């Protein structure tokens, strides 16, 4: 594994270390001030753990980065650690997930590490990871948790490209196709509440023939951006978003979300079979839907939403990719 924790005074950065025997289990672990930078045994990519920590740690004391070649689920692992008493903010990255989870319990498949070079024109000729999957655990105490997944999605979209849109409540879309998904869970340790924010992003094209709609991939927009560079671009902005949300809730993000709302003005079908026209979101992040019975406010995490028809002018499905977290 790769681990980075901000060095303490009197300790030099760049010290290489191996994980302690038996420390792969759940629970609180003490990595001290040890540092592993760059490639580590079992990892395909060289990860910018130090650069991320230098940007994040001043605003998030105790912040650490951990990268694993493979795990069942980054969200599941962080939830296990929280239940075992973990208290430090931690970014956990996995090059491969074997039992990834999405919203409403759906399975999420991460791309195999070391995937073949992308076939999108302009993509890097170097081997790439087909997807980026990571989870961030940190103490969070907002007055209202409503709209958190929307704020996280907005942070991802803002960090990447103006063309990206947001599908309520937890997806990032490119031309009506899913590019990324978000899964947020919470847990408690003593008097503190912790959030685990999981994000999965499709990077390279993959076989999408078994999916109803083939997902988008980041190489269509940013062919030179690989998983480590993508992580460095996303995480500092994500931490700032979470801290802003903790203090002010969703309201400061509402207007920016509306500008990227993929559903607004479109006929949609709810998971209960009812239909209506999406009318944006309110200051808490609730979905507003015009129905024959009047305005309906959708807040339940158990409600799924899909357009009743494709967006006019959107690219036709057919570019293969890797499904993202949630739905």
Summary of predicted features, one role per range:
Residues 2-10, 14, 31-45, 51, ...:
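Long, positively charged amphipathic alpha-helical accessory segments at protein N-termini or as interdomain linkers
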Residues 2-159, 224, 312, 317-327:
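N-terminal lobe of the biotin/lipoate ligase/transferase fold
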Residues 69, 166-168:
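Short loop/edge segments at beta-strand edges and connector loops
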């Amino acid at each position: 594994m790769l681990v980075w924790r901000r060095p303490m005074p009197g300790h030099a950065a760049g010290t290489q270390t191996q994980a302690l025997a038996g420390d792969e289990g759940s629970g609180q672990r003490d990595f001290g001030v040890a540092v592993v930078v760059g490639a580590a045994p079992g990892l395909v990519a060289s990860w910018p753990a130090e650069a991320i920590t230098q940007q994040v740690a001043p605003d998030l004391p105790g912040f650490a980065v951990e990268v694993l070649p493979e795990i069942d689920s980054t969200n599941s692992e962080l939830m296990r650690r929280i239940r075992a008493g973990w208290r430090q903010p931690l970014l956990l990255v996995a090059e491969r997930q074997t039992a990834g989870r999405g919203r409403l319990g759906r399975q999420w498949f991460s791309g195999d590490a070391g995937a073949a070079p992308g076939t999108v024109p302009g993509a890097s000729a170097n081997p790439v990871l087909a997807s980026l999957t990571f989870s961030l655990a940190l103490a969070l105490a907002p007055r209202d948790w409503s709209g958190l997944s929307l704020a996280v999605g907005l942070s991802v979209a803002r960090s990447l490209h103006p063309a990206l849109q947001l599908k309520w409540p937890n997806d990032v879309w490119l031309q009506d196709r899913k590019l990324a998904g978000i899964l947020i869970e919470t847990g408690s340790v003593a008097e503190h509440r912790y959030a685990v924010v999981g994000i999965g992003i499709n990077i390279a094209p993959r076989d999408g023939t078994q999916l109803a709609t083939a997902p988008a991939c980041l190489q269509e927009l940013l062919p030179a951006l690989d998983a480590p560079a993508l992580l460095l671009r996303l995480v500092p902005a994500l931490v700032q978003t979470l801290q802003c949300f903790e203090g002010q809730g969703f309201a400061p993000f509402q207007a920016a979300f509306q500008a990227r709302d993929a559903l607004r003005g479109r006929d949609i079908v709810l998971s209960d079979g009812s239909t209506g026209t999406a009318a944006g979101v309110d200051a808490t992040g609730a979905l507003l839907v015009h129905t024959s019975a009047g305005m309906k406010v959708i807040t339940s995490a158990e409600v799924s939403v899909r357009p009743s028809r494709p967006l006019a002018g959107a690219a036709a499905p057919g570019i293969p990719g890797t499904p993202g977290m949630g739905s």
